[in-house]
């Protein structure tokens, strides 16, 4: 979604610090945790079976979790599909979300949430300017709004900010945002909610970005990594699609890995990839994925068509339902990597990977108070934005500076001698990737909402 330049300043009252909202959340929900390179629900391996959910897309931005009636309408379809997770790209952090989140919890459905909006996000063309205290106040307020729900599975710190070689120079700012979110969650004494990044469907630097998000000190590392993948276009297979090579490339990776978008629509969608994604061919490395997308929008990826209170199932709905019904999760733990662990940071390889060193920008000075005082009230969709406002970072962070009281939510070792240490960047010999329209037309803004 193309965000317009923001010219009005967002006034954040430094003297008025509001407590996190009082949330009446379900107590009988089992939170999802991280062990090694996998997600767990209690003692049981958890595989994401979900869809991307943003009715209206970028042309009619709305918060689906604040729309209780629409949420309950769609939960009936989620249950019919057998989903356990939805991803939402943008929410209004000034609104109440209790009714929908509790209804999702009652249905056994978890939320993976992008903290950004088109107006509050890292601009890949101006990452230094857009990484500022006004931006951090917004995303921290979003954490406040959702941390109390036990079915909040994870937060995305960014979506497709890096979409080619040159834009990889923004990677330190994406990683800094991830660090800041993790520190905020711990400093505010919330439960350990995983934070990670959703990468674009590009071969250029996908693996380097994954390595980068899992290198350095524990406070600098992500809790998981996800990427969008439209390379399996039916009719295809595990090998023809190149997915076998991706499994090979990511074998030994120390963080949970899943597909944040999948479902090529070049041909008729049969979702043949589902049988591979939840088989032992992949479950040692992958933890499932999210199908793009629930509602029919301009890019024609929809499973259903929504008109007011009416929901019409499209052919892809039945195809996905059938694919899920035919595919069970593997028994046991799916051969996950129990050790986990950090890997070395990738070396600069311009123009594909244009990151000079491992240093990250320090959190902007005015944003430090949020760690102890809280972020205060979120401005919501009506806020003026943060792209060109606020105080920027003026220093380089010391490793460990983003630490806070509490253990790592990744539950993995910070040593580069762990199982992930052998992860190396292969030559780009994968099968040709058919990139979805979402990636091809993504804008210069690394907004949390990139829908077409």
UniProtKB/Swiss-Prot annotation:
Pro-sequence residue ranges: 420-452
Organism the protein comes from: Aspergillus fumigatus (strain ATCC MYA-4609 / CBS 101355 / FGSC A1100 / Af293)
InterPro entries in the record: Glucanosyltransferase (IPR004886), Glycoside_hydrolase_SF (IPR017853)
Entry binding sites for (1,3-beta-D-glucosyl)n 1: 89, 159, 292
Name of the molecule in the record: 1,3-beta-glucanosyltransferase gel1
Segments of skewed composition (Polar residues): 325-340
GO cellular component terms, semicolon-separated: fungal-type cell wall; plasma membrane; side of membrane
Signal peptide (residue range): 1-19
Subcellular location: Cell membrane
Glycosylation sites: 249, 337
SUPFAM superfamilies reported for this sequence: (Trans)glycosidases (SSF51445)
Protein EC: 2.4.1.-
The record's account of how the chain is modified after translation: The GPI-like anchor contains a phosphoceramide lipid group.
Entry binding sites for (1,3-beta-D-glucosyl)n 2: 160, 201, 206
Superkingdom to which the source organism belongs: Eukaryota
Membrane topology: Lipid-anchor; GPI-anchor
Coiled-coil zones: none
The family this protein is said to belong to: Belongs to the glycosyl hydrolase 72 family.
Encoding gene, per UniProt annotation: gel1
Transmembrane segments: none
Region span, Disordered: 325-419
Bias kind Low complexity: ranges: 393-419
UniProt keyword annotations, A-Z: Cell membrane, Disulfide bond, Glycoprotein, GPI-anchor, Lipoprotein, Membrane, Signal, Transferase
Lipidation (GPI-like-anchor amidated alanine): 419
One example of a Gene Ontology biological process annotation: fungal-type cell wall (1->3)-beta-D-glucan biosynthetic process
Record function comment: Splits internally a 1,3-beta-glucan molecule and transfers the newly generated reducing end (the donor) to the non-reducing end of another 1,3-beta-glucan molecule (the acceptor) forming a 1,3-beta linkage, resulting in the elongation of 1,3-beta-glucan chains in the cell wall. Involved in cell wall morphogenesis.
Listed Pfam families: Glyco_hydro_72
């Amino acid at each position: 979604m193309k965000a317009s330049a923001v010219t009005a300043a967002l006034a954040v009252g430094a003297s008025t610090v509001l407590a996190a909202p009082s949330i009446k959340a379900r107590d009988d929900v089992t939170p999802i945790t991280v062990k090694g390179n996998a997600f767990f629900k209690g003692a049981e391996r958890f595989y994401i079976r979900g869809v991307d959910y943003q009715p209206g897309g970028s042309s009619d931005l709305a918060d689906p979790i604040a729309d209780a009636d629409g949420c309950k309408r769609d939960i009936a379809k989620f249950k019919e599909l057998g989903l356990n997770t939805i991803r939402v790209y943008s929410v209004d952090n000034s609104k109440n979300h209790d009714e929908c989140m509790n209804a999702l919890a009652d249905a056994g459905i978890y939320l993976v949430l992008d903290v950004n909006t088109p107006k509050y996000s890292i601009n890949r063309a101006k990452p230094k300017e857009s990484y500022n205290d006004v931006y951090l106040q917004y995303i921290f307020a979003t954490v406040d709004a959702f941390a109390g729900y036990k079915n909040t599975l994870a937060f995305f710190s960014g979506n497709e900010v890096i979409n080619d070689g040159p834009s990889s120079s923004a990677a330190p700012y994406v990683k800094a945002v991830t660090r800041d979110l993790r520190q905020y969650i711990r400093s505010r004494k919330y439960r350990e909610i995983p934070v990670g990044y959703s990468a674009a469907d590009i071969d250029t630097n996908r693996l380097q970005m994954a390595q980068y998000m899992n290198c350095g000190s524990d406070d600098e590392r992500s809790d998981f990594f996800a990427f969008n993948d439209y390379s399996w276009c039916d009719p295809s297979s595990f090998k023809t699609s190149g997915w076998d090579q991706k499994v090979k490339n990511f074998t030994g990776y120390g963080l949970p890995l899943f597909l944040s978008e999948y479902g090529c629509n070049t041909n008729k969608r049969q979702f043949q990839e589902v049988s591979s994604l939840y088989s032992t061919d992949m479950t040692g490395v992958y933890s499932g994925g999210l199908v793009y997308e629930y509602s029919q929008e301009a890019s024609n990826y929809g499973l259903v068509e929504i008109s007011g209170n009416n929901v019409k199932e499209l052919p892809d709905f039945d195809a996905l339902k059938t694919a899920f019904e035919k595919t069970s999760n593997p028994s046991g733990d799916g051969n996950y990597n129990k050790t986990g662990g950090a890997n070395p940071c990738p070396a600069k390889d311009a123009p594909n990977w244009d990151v000079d060193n491992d240093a990250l920008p320090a959190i902007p000075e005015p944003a430090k108070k949020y760690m102890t005082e809280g972020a205060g009230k979120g401005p919501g969709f009506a806020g003026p934005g943060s792209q060109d406002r606020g105080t920027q970072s003026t220093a380089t962070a010391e490793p460990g500076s983003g630490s806070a009281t509490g253990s790592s939510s990744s539950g993995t070792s910070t040593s580069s001698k762990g199982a992930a240490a052998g992860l190396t960047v292969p030559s780009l010999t994968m099968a040709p990737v058919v990139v979805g329209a979402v990636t091809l037309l993504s804008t210069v803004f690394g907004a949390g909402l990139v829908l077409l």
